[in-house]
Amino acid sequence: MTESKNSFNAKSTLEVGDKSYDYFALSAVPGMEKLPYSLKVLGENLLRTEDGANITNEHIEAIANWDASSDPSIEIQFTPARVLMQDFTGVPCVVDLATMREAVAALGGDPNDVNPLNPAEMVIDHSVIVEAFGRPDALAKNVEIEYERNEERYQFLRWGSESFSNFRVVPPGTGIVHQVNIEYLARVVFDNEGLAYPDTCIGTDSHTTMENGLGILGWGVGGIEAEAAMLGQPVSMLIPRVVGFKLTGEIPVGVTATDVVLTITEMLRDHGVVQKFVEFYGSGVKAVPLANRATIGNMSPEFGSTCAMFPIDEETTKYLRLTGRPEEQVALVEAYAKAQGMWLDEDTVEAEYSEYLELDLSTVVPSIAGPKRPQDRILLSEAKEQFRKDLPTYTDDAVSVDTSIPATRMVNEGGGQPEGGVEADNYNASWAGSGESLATGAEGRPSKPVTVASPQGGEYTIDHGMVAIASITSCTNTSNPSVMIGAGLIARKAAEKGLKSKPWVKTICAPGSQVVDGYYQRADLWKDLEAMGFYLSGFGCTTCIGNSGPLPEEISAAINEHDLTATAVLSGNRNFEGRISPDVKMNYLASPIMVIAYAIAGTMDFDFENEALGQDQDGNDVFLKDIWPSTEEIEDTIQQAISRELYEADYADVFKGDKQWQELDVPTGDTFEWDENSTYIRKAPYFDGMPVEPVAVTDIQGARVLAKLGDSVTTDHISPASSIKPGTPAAQYLDEHGVERHDYNSLGSRRGNHEVMMRGTFANIRLQNQLVDIAGGYTRDFTQEGAPQAFIYDASVNYKAAGIPLVVLGGKEYGTGSSRDWAAKGTNLLGIRAVITESFERIHRSNLIGMGVVPLQFPAGESHESLGLDGTETFDITGLTALNEGETPKTVKVTATKENGDVVEFDAVVRIDTPGEADYYRHGGILQYVLRQMAASSK
């Protein structure tokens, strides 16, 4: 770490017990004491990293003199203490670092200079797919298949962990990255050779903000920005506006943390918090347990905010002790927070905020969200009514969705069973079909009853609204003890009443850490969950990222052959179209407790207040209220089942891994030996032929529109992580390289191979490109006579051959969702030079710049619709060359020429927001910028 210039004489000594620590005292700078918590963390960061060039005393004073009412205008350089990764985004990061070692050497530098300068940690959690479910050996089967499919990736990651210094990998089967982070990896306060400072962490997953619940400032970034941070580059940002969110009251009986977070998500989305910090304060904060704070922080990307911070207080240190942190570390956290004015207690002076919201927690009511956005909250009491309102949208054929996948499918096509893989008895015969029907009570809604014969015997009738997947999944909820214990207890009560999950429901339980398995065993809850079909499926993200695996063959066939509108209910954070399963059209977020309830109901067309879930052994109707666990029951079970010893035991050898991990055949050497025949790991192309000096920025002439899209296009739409559909360009590539269909794996697992990923860009089966009438990865190819329909990738190849640049037109909230760098990498590799939208989500906008694609916005109040653009025009964009003179133009002129010669002109806003971003764009991307800096410094 470079020594700070310390121009404010802020370096001081902190005594904690019998130890002394150096630290940079905020009290040395007038004004710091009145700042919101999150800005105090930024202020300390600048004090500690002040170098007189990139970070000056003027920057420090700008933080101290922050004007809560002003719009962001002052750029600062934030240096995170560490970087966190998961394997889907982490594999391409390691690929890029390995490629950079070779590129540095080619530019005359030392390849061994390419190492993370700050701790970089990866948790492998994105690769497990739920093939087996509802059976005692589901976990073992899914792990076995995971290693078979991902052996090459895992060998590569082990090579990286042994080749790069300051880089550690938590093996698969341990848990979800964000839960492992808050339970083990997070420091809260760093001790770096006697220097104490706040733990700050950026991550290659948007839900990195879960750590905000621990008082750790951090957020999700694209993999390319994370790589730059690992290599010592600070994160360029504007001092943000901070939204103060006041919490009062206490959560009422019968309301879960999930209900609270869905309520907050709706409020903040309605308010508008993109590119803002959110900070929770008020008397209600102390009543929010740490696990609930983490759940709220986790959903920051769904709010749209950069982060969602809670301060450090007694609840924080209580959690650190529970999770096995050393007492010396806990003492440092408390002493440091108090010394810096970062500790919350009754004497804390309320900070000033840019904007204010307030929620009385006692007013929160049971809720779910869906069917396609996390912010679309629905009161549980109105869920049936709202489902019936939404259903016609999904049953009419206004937009044709390409569902030409055969009903009997291979596993990696998103349905059916793998050849030679998991057997057909995926769910327990004890809860097989016995004549149950969803056609009953269908009056008043679209209905298309289909009778299905169960392989286990019997038959049942499914219909629109069937719950095809009920999944306890995701970092948001699956290690929150209150809702996880609650799920086990509602299963127990349901089993006691003789209730069962419906036979058409795929039941999944994938906890966020092994600690959950431990307290389920202690509380003897597994037998009750298993009675509902919820066997342990894996420790990883599973359903929430689209790794729900295939539905049983007969159910998948019935859904697709009869075009049924199936639903999924998951305890996740995202429910975007096409994300959860290709067989499912409507996705709902709910607490783990409600996941169990919906599995029993079997349909979204259900009124939990007035309809019985079934009958008990005496023939009495059983309602949700009859099996809902009380707060006292949940708390008593938590006290009995959860202890510090559980955490200490599970994390004692967290980097060791299981026998399969330890026995992997790992390559050696400082540089990686690329295999040109590999379909998983390929040398990245971004530095091929890169000159020592950047090429001048040019305007864009004669561009064609590759895709014309609407509002809320997600990074899932742009770069899906889920299954690879046969016949698509990505599948054709794998076919040509000898990969069998049952070994396709997911697009997310292939992110180390740019050839697969560029073919999978804009390939989501639900993508609605307005240039064509069919949903999926299609466009019109204007290089061909009559501009016929073509795969987006195939058309891009023709455009490249013809020397024609490309643009994408979009609507509001373009790039919402995951911090998926491949959504920008794929955009770049397809030849797209500019994306023009009404608004961008923060991470994707930054990622586009990081890949040399310019983000542009239509003039305020305008859109491609209002301007009459239909996507058949030729585009010229002028004014970008001003960047060569060191200036970032506020707007550029866009001229769209229609086929009949008519012209539409407008001034597009250039969304290159900071000088640092302008530097990255001038160099063709952030990695090219970093590479040139490294090569120059090592000569």
From Swiss-Prot:
Q: What induces it?
A: Repressed by AcnR, RipA, GlxR and activated by RamA. Repression by RipA is part of iron homeostasis and serves to reduce the iron demand under iron limitation. The activation of acn transcription by RamA serves to allow the increased carbon flux through the TCA cycle during growth on acetate. GlxR is a global regulator that binds to the acn promoter and presumably represses its transcription in the presence of cyclic AMP (cAMP).
Activity-pH behavior: Optimum pH is between 7.5 and 7.75.
BP term (GO), one: tricarboxylic acid cycle
* UniProtKB keywords: Iron, Iron-sulfur, Lyase, Metal-binding, RNA-binding, Tricarboxylic acid cycle
- Describe the outcome of a gene knockout: Cells lacking this gene are glutamate auxotrophic in glucose minimal medium, show a strong growth defect, and secret large amounts of acetate. Deletion causes a strong selection pressure for secondary mutations within the gltA gene, which might be caused by a growth-inhibitory level of cytoplasmic citrate.
Metal-binding in keyword set:
yes
Subunit arrangement?
Monomer.
Put simply, this protein is called Aconitate hydratase A
Organism equals: Corynebacterium glutamicum (strain ATCC 13032 / DSM 20300 / JCM 1318 / BCRC 11384 / CCUG 27702 / LMG 3730 / NBRC 12168 / NCIMB 10025 / NRRL B-2784 / 534)
